[in-house]
Swiss-Prot record:
Native source species: Orientia tsutsugamushi (strain Boryong) (Rickettsia tsutsugamushi)
UniProt similarity note: Belongs to the bacterial ribosomal protein bL17 family.
Protein name (record): Large ribosomal subunit protein bL17
SUPFAM superfamilies: Prokaryotic ribosomal protein L17 (SSF64263)
Highest taxon above the source species: Bacteria
Subunit and interaction comment: Part of the 50S ribosomal subunit. Contacts protein L32.
Length: 145
C-alpha cells in the first residue's frame, strides 16, 4: 500500500534523486528556462518554489539552508539578489510548466519549466556576471597571499 507516500521515485535512489533535483534547480536558476521530461519538471517545481520562498527571507540562516540544498553559492547569490526581490510581492506560483511534445527516441513527454515574469533577453547573463565576480574575488585573494 502507498499510503502517505508523496513524490515520484523516477527510478532513482534517494541520493541520486536529490542530486538530480539540485543540479536541475541550479540550471533553472542559471538559465531561467530548461527543457526536461514532464515527470522531472513536475517534481522540480515544488523543490525550486520552496527555495525561492526561503530566499525571500534574505537572512544568513536562509542562505545557509539554500547552500545545503543546492550546493552552488553562485546560484544561491542569484536567488537572493535577483529572484527573491523579483517575486517579493508574489505568494507562490513562481514557476510554470509548458508541455513540449514528445522526445523522439523513447516518446517521453517533454516540458519546458520556466520562471514566471522572467526577462527573456537576459538568457543567463546575470549568472555569468556573478560567476565572473566570484572568480575575480578568488584571484585577488590568491594574489594577496
Amino acid at each position: 500500500m502507498r499510503h502517505r507516500v508523496s513524490g515520484r521515485k523516477l527510478n532513482r535512489t534517494t541520493s541520486h534523486l536529490l542530486a538530480m533535483l539540485a543540479n536541475m534547480s541550479v540550471s533553472l536558476i542559471q538559465h531561467e528556462q530548461i527543457n526536461t521530461t514532464l515527470p522531472k519538471a513536475k517534481e522540480l517545481r515544488p523543490f525550486v518554489e520552496k527555495l525561492i520562498t526561503v530566499a525571500k527571507k534574505g537572512n544568513l540562516n536562509a542562505r545557509r539552508y539554500l547552500i545545503s540544498k543546492i550546493k552552488n553559492e553562485i546560484a544561491v547569490e542569484k536567488l537572493m539578489t535577483t529572484l527573491a526581490p523579483r517575486y517579493a510581492e508574489r505568494h507562490g506560483g513562481y514557476i510554470r510548466i509548458l508541455k513540449a511534445g514528445f522526445r523522439y527516441g523513447d516518446m517521453a513527454p517533454m516540458a519546458y519549466i520556466e520562471f514566471v515574469d522572467r526577462n527573456i533577453e537576459s538568457k543567463g547573463k546575470e549568472f555569468k556576471a556573478l560567476k565572473n565576480d566570484a572568480r575575480n574575488a578568488k584571484l585577488i585573494a590568491e594574489q594577496s597571499n
